Amino acid sequence: MSCPNNSGNFLMDPLMGGSSSFRDEGYSSNSGMYIHTAAECGYSVMKVEPSPLSKSRDVPAGSVLLSSFQDAPYLSAQPSTWTPGTKSSRDQQLVAQCLQPCSFPAGNVKEEAFCCFYQDGSKRKQTTESATYIRLRDNRCGPEQTTTQARGCFQMYNREEPQQDDQLFAPACSLLHLGTSVESQSKISCSKFATETGKDERKEEKARSDGCSETSDNEELKGRNLQSQRTLFLCLNVSAILLRNSRVLVFGNSHDASSEKTTGNWLKAKSGRKKRCPYTKHQTLELEKEFLFNMYLSRERRLEISRSINLTDRQVKIWFQNRRMKLKKLNRESREREQGVVYNYC
């Protein structure tokens, strides 16, 4: 019979008859392993585990070395009920397809340190299916399969009948490698974490957009308030300036008119009319100084003064004539006042 290219598959039909593990009969010739007896465990469940002799040289009295049973078959005709040391293997079972049995000498198979679990042999007569030895591949091929978290362990159960708490294993069974489901759990946790992070990022983006919109609205409102305040302030300033100007125009003009009527101004006469030939202060000052120094000007001096104060020769000549006439008028008025005072005393 052909066998697939797998070092872990071998024929177990010739090995099913023989010794029993309950009677302390070993499996193969391996000086590095020994089997604990049922009397040592204290219950009907028997646990097989690798124990190097280099680390445990003192072998217990109830244990039997595998090296003492070189010609014993590998498995017994009626396997006892073996259960794993942890409760997780009772709850989580791995279901897989049985491979076709292959025939090659079992002596060429390399011994490995693993645990084998068997079911009660009372129900072995119910079925005639052949038991195969299967080592499963990694969990990444079947993420939907759940496995126990125990490496190097093998569990035997029936592929046709469902497992119960009281009936753990079937007689026609498969040896399956129990791996860990860390990768599937990590994938699920990573997907959950990615979805949660995506939701958090979306919430943060929404909050930021809402905050930005609120800040922009607040800035717009502040800008509008500032503009309205500025316009109101400008309107108040303009109204205040207009009120001041109106007051100055109303009250100031009347005050100026009354004062000009009594005293007069250098631009206006006593009557309030505007003078016909107004001069600037600088021009009148220069002409007054020159008139006090000399009431009559020569032609050369008149030209010099007109050039210095930016006036024409004729304007300077007319101003001097008017000033002399004014001086004569003032002298005559003063003389008349003096004569009137003298006459009053008489």
Swiss-Prot record:
It is found in: Nucleus. GO terms for cellular component: nucleus. Its main location: nucleus. Residues 199-211 have a biased composition (Basic and acidic residues). Keywords: Developmental protein, DNA-binding, Homeobox, Nucleus, Transcription, Transcription regulation. Residues 199-223 are annotated as: Disordered. It holds the Pfam family Homeodomain. It comes from the Eukaryota. Residues 272-331 bind DNA. One of its GO terms (molecular function) is DNA-binding transcription factor activity, RNA polymerase II-specific. Belongs to the Abd-B homeobox family. Sequence-specific transcription factor which is part of a developmental regulatory system that provides cells with specific positional identities on the anterior-posterior axis. This is Homeobox protein Hox-C10a.
